[in-house]
Amino acid sequence: MTLFLLYILYALTLSIVLSRAGHRSRAVPASGATRRHPTRVLIVGATGGTGRQLVAQALERGCVVTALVRNPLKLQIKHPQLNVIQGDVLDYASVEAATRGQEAVISALGHKRFFYPTRILSAGTRNILRAMQAHGVSRLVCETSLGIGDSAGRLGLYFTFFVIPVLLPFYFLDKSRQERIIAASDVEWVIARPGMLNNNKKQGRSRHGWKIGNALWTVRISRADVADFMLNQLASDRYLRSAVGVCW
């Protein structure tokens, strides 16, 4: 019983830490403003589940896409308007080279080093922002997750008391740092916080806002619909400088 209570205390404490560490959006009236959709887009994390969807859907929208990847063979997408650059987000030189000439950057950065402390997400994001500033790229759309900042506890009991504290504490702490770094920057940014991801087909619809998710059950969304939402933010100011939840 004592160990169980200590574990519950640990999980609750971690949720509070994530709440304070991540960005806390101030809900403001939606401007509804739109702008010309960027045609030259850099996608970081392009070989992940969401990243591949971003590449495919951006190409469908007519964008000229640059994908920064560590292993080009993992992307498995061929297209005349796709430029694949081999590099590492932790290497500023490769990030800077990939950012040159872009109009916007989309980050679906992730990794699978879950079980020890890492700053891959936050350090990589610093390099992205530095390169954007160097080349005058103004718009960043970044994927993090529900369960961070003012969405802490909104991934349901299963994530709050098992998945995050047992499997992903370091990952979520670094996502929190990533959000804070973005929020402190001068770029035009939107953070997308999806619920639990799956590989279902795109439904073309989603719920999004500052109060998405709940404390009891886990909300879900496909990677395809997350990619669709993120691409829509390139030409919309509705959630400018906000961290917004997105789910079905």
Locations of regions flagged by a protein language model:
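Non-catalytic terminal and boundary segments that flank Rossmann-like NAD(P)-dependent oxidoreductase
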Residues: 1-39
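Conserved Rossmann-fold cofactor-binding substructure of NAD(P)-dependent oxidoreductases
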Residues: 80-102
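NAD(P)-cofactor binding segment of oxidoreductase domains
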Residues: 112-140, 171-173, 177
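Conserved beta-loop-beta element that borders a ligand/cofactor-binding pocket
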Residues: 179-200
